[in-house]
Design a protein with these regions (language model features):
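Acidic, divalent-metal-binding catalytic cores of TOPRIM
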Residues: 1-149
Length: 149
């Protein structure tokens, strides 16, 4: 048992100490959410940080087993992922993710990708850095975050 505990990813281990877990597709979503939280008013930020934990699935396909595992551990799970509509290799995971979560109220499927929501075209590379740079250049505080986001 101890060996298993030692092998659990630190990010997954934190899931046991919060009320809700948000599973995101990858690094870009993690960066955007972290920067969003950093700009929240003090009380809201503290409430979010004490009640929620964000876990990167590190790929759309990995969301499914991660959700199943967290649900089996009776953890309250929510998911945000790109819709990737028209992208064959990625769109096919939308329905299995929805089925694994089995609660549409806890699922947010972005129209296409997070860059669309943020208002710029998705780059071919360095997506997390480009998102971070976009936020640094455009968001000064909570009130400057786009309403669509």
């Amino acid at each position: 048992m101890l060996e298993m505990i030692l092998k659990i990813d630190e990010s997954i281990a934190r899931c046991f100490f919060v009320k809700k877990v948000l599973v995101v597709e990858g690094d870009t979503e993690q960066v955007v959410l972290t920067e969003t939280i950093n700009r929240m008013p003090y009380d809201l930020k503290n409430q979010i940080l004490s009640d929620w934990h964000i876990v990167r699935a590190r790929g759309k396909a990995a969301i499914i087993p991660l959700v199943k595992y967290l649900k089996a551990m009776t953890i309250d799970v929510y998911v945000i992922h790109d819709g990737d509509f028209g992208v064959d290799g990625a769109e096919r995971f939308n329905e299995p993710i929805k089925n694994a979560l089995s609660d549409d109220d806890k699922l947010v499927v972005l129209k296409n990708c997070i860059e669309d929501v943020l208002g710029y075209s998705a780059p071919k590379s360095d997506k997390p850095f480009v998102a971070y740079k976009h936020i640094q250049d455009n968001w000064t505080d909570w009130s400057s975050i786009p309403e669509l986001w």
